[in-house]
Amino acid sequence: MTSRLRALGGRINNTRTSELPKEKTRSEVICSIRFLDGLVQTFKVNKQDLGQSLLDMAYGHLGVTEKEYFGLQHGDDPVDSPRWLEASKPLRKQLKGGFPCTLHFRVRYFIPDPNTLQQEQTRHLYFLQLKMDVCEGRLTCPLNSAVVLASYAVQSHFGDFNSSIHHPGYLADSQFIPDQNDDFLSKVESLHEQHSGLKQSEAESCYINIARTLDFYGVELHGGRDLHNLDLMIGIASAGIAVYRKYICTSFYPWVNILKISFKRKKFFIHQRQKQAESREHIVAFNMLNYRSCKNLWKSCVEHHSFFQAKKLLPQEKNVLSQYWTLGSRNPKKSVNNQYCKKVIGGMVWNPVMRRSLSVERLETKSLPSRSPPITPNWRSPRLRHEIRKPRHSSADNLANEMTYITETEDVFYTYKGPLSPKDSDSEVSQNHSPHRESLSENNPAQSCLTQKSSSSVSPSSNAPGSCSPDGVDQRFLEDYHKVTKGGFVEDASQYYCDKSDDGDGYLVLIRITPDEEGRFGFNLKGGVDQKMPLVVSRINPESPADTCMPKLNEGDQIVLINGRDISEHTHDQVVMFIKASRESHSRELALVIRRKAVRSLAEIRSEDELSQLFPEAMFPACPEGGDSLEGSMELLKKGLESGTVLIQFEQLYRKKPGLAVSFAKLPQNLDKNRYKDVLPYDTTRVLLQGNEDYINASYVNMEMPAANLVNKYIATQGPLPNTCAQFWQVVWDQKLSLVVMLTTLTERGRTKCHQYWPDPPDIMDHGIFHIQCQTEDCTIAYVSREMLVTNTETGEEHTVTHLQYVAWPDHGVPDDSSDFLEFVKYVRSLRVDGEPALVHCSAGIGRTGVLVTMETAMCLIERNLPVYPLDIVRKMRDQRAMMVQTSSQYKFVCEAILRVYEEGLVQRLDPS
């Protein structure tokens, strides 16, 4: 028997029981933990204990309640291969470097929006970690951003500036960035004075909100090499895996595009979802320094994915959602639900059959509603600028709020990727994003009667991409649906715009219903994924809210979205639960997007109001009757905003003018000069550069106003890329432009929106044959004004340019108030030079750019007492550059701003004589 055990690798344990306590005593060791405040605490542990015991000691020492964000990092590991203490593994197998040992308490998972953290202590620890990372150079940032960050750190530590205590040089012993100098500290001291009144927690929140806009926020970097042995960094972020060369992101692989990650010896593999018309799996490979670092990277990827996927789910929804996600992990405890997880040797598997993939030719990103502050040294700090949202507590009684929470914290990182040379191994992939399925599982009758009273409004009933967002409905409500079904492009959210017609028959209508006093909506449903049939309205109770709303809900209408939620994969009972949950929201409204197969006969339409809703007279307006005066056009605009018809008209308008080619933009040598692959200039209106390379993604947009004998000229262009800055300044030089208007920050929530094509004052930056010097920089609460000197190094000629950067546009959607924007437009008008184009850009050069052109054109017309038709303005713009004014929310914003300018007299009328 003994020999048999030895043959199998076993051995007989003859250890006496009396020896066990002595063994345990000898295994006690000392571990030191360095916390984020710099203090070191020693703990006595047993080597046989699991890592969780030491983690619990660290958590208990600080009194941390949100423990999931933090971990213990090994202190002796290289910077480019961080290793974390595993909770489920014995300490003796992890701490092999001898005792006593030192570990570092650190934030491991940085969520996209730290404002949603529940505990102030957690936010304080985030602040300490970010401050340390900036100070030690792990989190790089521009000098101007570093000044602002340091000023908030000073406010947190010293409190309000006091001239009697804080004498010049009081920060001499403070360290904020690796290579700071006296000039840097003097700027910090100056800015500290502006933060008077901010509490410590508020200053720290401001610090976090700026830090989270930096490119490397929340990115865990691992060193590696490509297949040609060239150095690169692999970063693990909340939404996927990024590849950096010389600290520039060259590729990004979202989790939704990754089927499996694996490793073999020193090679790390990313298995991507197949593209359309591809029969083979697409695999990207990297070389790591050694087997340990390769396994370490793989493990960290698995744990990051598991953590951030779980954070997207409400606790009540995890069990249901696990049906749609199949995740494999070496540690099943890390995944959402153990029974639905596969264990895969050396890899993580997603089951593509269990999820509905969107178009693989698209990349979507979502931004948070909070604003990204600009990176300028004179940025003001008052609370009104930093709209720090209160953390929301998850509650099953308020499903609507939880749905918003999930949407807002969902993040997909995006950085422009130009085509790499053939020697680069991490090739660009097409990327997509599938919404996760959210549901509550409760027992409800197979058919339920639901009712409601009051009003609703119509939504776009067209096949054009995009959506109508009437007042009171979340702006993401229809936009997300059209992005899912039609590939609709949103400037702040997508790399592609795909103009696809809807696959289904009929047209879409948005219906809003408010329940009656008893909480009933008044209609029955049949169908669901469990019944293997679409969800259809089977019965409408007479005189119920569903029957009296306009447009009314009809029997046979197919339910597509409920409060912005795609219900195509949900059971009947789950859908009923979603509808009931809407009664608990603040507005109590139920917003349904339904597909209606055919328009009812006129005999079925009971009122003229309903007829005008379904067939608005101004669906294809020319010059509406009574609208040939300014007053008449403003009255029509006001009524259109109230009824929602202006948004329907906007959705009916073509996004690209039929028949206009974009062939030059698609030439092979020009492809990498386009930030977005479907936002391209028409051949007929594109700006031609002087010289051999004549292409830039820019269009001439001339807004002619014959009745005013006026033409406003623009050059609308995308935000420059690192490889197009020289062409950008070539346009400025060729056209002798004196005004450049920028409508975005450089990054919004860590995503690059525009490359910085100008230097910080008073530095000089070279782009091609041009020297650019920023001579002055003046910051206000809404915009930054710069004076730049452009010098042609070949001729020695100089040209002065005014650069205006609007920084108050929120990361998501549109501004809540138009005051700042209107002041900015008025300032732009004051700097215009007669007959000279103004160069305007945002990120794609169509959304916010179109809003500004529309607003300035409308102001000119109001000033001259001429009628204003916003849709005609948009049509004229789209005849010259596709997709100008990009979303319904942008169009609604500019229409409301135009009406406000008229009603409040914000523009001085010119004397008709």
Swiss-Prot record:
Residues modified as Phosphoserine are 357, 359, 367, 381, 425
Please provide, alphabetically and separated by semicolons, the GO molecular function terms listed in this UniProt record: ATPase binding; cytoskeletal protein binding; phosphotyrosine residue binding; protein tyrosine phosphatase activity; sodium channel regulator activity
Check the record and name the SMART domains matching this protein. Answer: B41, FERM_C, PDZ, PTPc, PTPc_motif
All copies of the FERM domain together span 29-312
Active-site residues are 842
Q: Biased composition, Basic residues: where in the chain?
A: 382-393
Question: What range(s) does the PDZ domain occupy?
Answer: 510-582
Q: Which GO terms describe its cellular component?
A: cytoplasm; cytoplasmic side of plasma membrane; cytoskeleton
| PROSITE patterns on file | FERM_2, FERM_3, PDZ, TYR_PHOSPHATASE_1, TYR_PHOSPHATASE_2, TYR_PHOSPHATASE_PTP
Q: What EC numbers are recorded for this enzyme?
A: 3.1.3.48
The leader peptide range reads: none
Matching CDD domains: FERM_B-lobe, FERM_C_PTPN4_PTPN3_like, PDZ_PTPN3-4-like, PTPc-N3
Keywords attached to this Swiss-Prot or TrEMBL record, sorted alphabetically, are:
Cell membrane, Cytoplasm, Cytoskeleton, Hydrolase, Membrane, Phosphoprotein, Protein phosphatase
Which InterPro entries has this protein been placed in?
A: Band_41_domain, FERM/acyl-CoA-bd_prot_sf, FERM_2, FERM_central, FERM_CS, FERM_domain, FERM_N, FERM_PH-like_C
* Phosphothreonine: residues carrying this PTM: 376
Q: Give the reaction(s) catalysed.
A: O-phospho-L-tyrosyl-[protein] + H2O = L-tyrosyl-[protein] + phosphate
So what does this one do? May act at junctions between the membrane and the cytoskeleton.
Give the protein's recorded name.
Tyrosine-protein phosphatase non-receptor type 3
Q: Which organism is it from?
A: Mus musculus
Gene symbol of the encoding locus: Ptpn3
